[in-house]
Amino acid sequence: MRSHTGEEELRRRLRLIHLLHQTNPYPTGSGSANQRRQKRRRWRQRWQQLLALADRIYSFPDPPTDTPLDLAIQQLQNLAIESIPDPPTNIPEALCDPTENSRSPQA
């Protein structure tokens, strides 16, 4: 009976990992080249976080039966994906102004 519960626990963890992977689909091809590049970069960052989280879920030990449920819940709440901030939408004027090029020699 113990091996049956172990198999069920493994199936539950694998379903959870599968659900995590489904929540991060590969980005679509719309937008400019730079926008597509940024989308892929952010997707790759989220993917790395999901892989790390899935590894932690898979290797997370079962709580012992004598451990209080609150402690087990607290340990599970520590498993979280960090939010990745979006890049700024507008570029500062100092970077956009071609007349102020610091590399050009002053005549």
UniProtKB/Swiss-Prot annotation:
Chain segments carrying region Disordered: 21-41, 83-107
Region Homomultimerization, annotated ranges: 16-24
GO molecular-function terms, A-Z: DNA-binding transcription factor activity; RNA binding
Entry-linked Gene3D superfamilies: 6.10.140.630
InterPro entries membership: REV_protein
Polar residues bias: start-end ranges: 21-34
Example of a GO biological process term: mRNA transport
Disulphide connectivity of cysteines: none
Top-rank taxon: Viruses
Major localisation: host cell
Locus of motif Nuclear export signal: 69-81
Localization per Swiss-Prot or TrEMBL: Host nucleus, Host nucleolus; Host cytoplasm
One CC-aspect GO term: host cell cytoplasm
Keywords carried by this UniProt record: Host cytoplasm, Host nucleus, mRNA transport, RNA-binding, Transport
Positions of short motif Nuclear localization signal and RNA-binding (RRE): 32-48
Domain notes: The RNA-binding motif binds to the RRE, a stem-and-loop structure present in incompletely spliced viral pre-mRNAs. This region also contains the NLS which mediates nuclear localization. These overlapping functions prevent Rev bound to RRE from undesirable return to the nucleus. When Rev binds the RRE, the NLS becomes masked while the NES remains accessible.
Role summary: Escorts unspliced or incompletely spliced viral pre-mRNAs (late transcripts) out of the nucleus of infected cells. These pre-mRNAs carry a recognition sequence called Rev responsive element (RRE) located in the env gene, that is not present in fully spliced viral mRNAs (early transcripts). This function is essential since most viral proteins are translated from unspliced or partially spliced pre-mRNAs which cannot exit the nucleus by the pathway used by fully processed cellular mRNAs.
Subunit text: Homomultimer; when bound to the RRE. Multimeric assembly is essential for activity.
Name of the protein this chain belongs to: Protein Rev
Organism: Simian immunodeficiency virus (isolate Mm142-83) (SIV-mac)
Gene (name only): rev
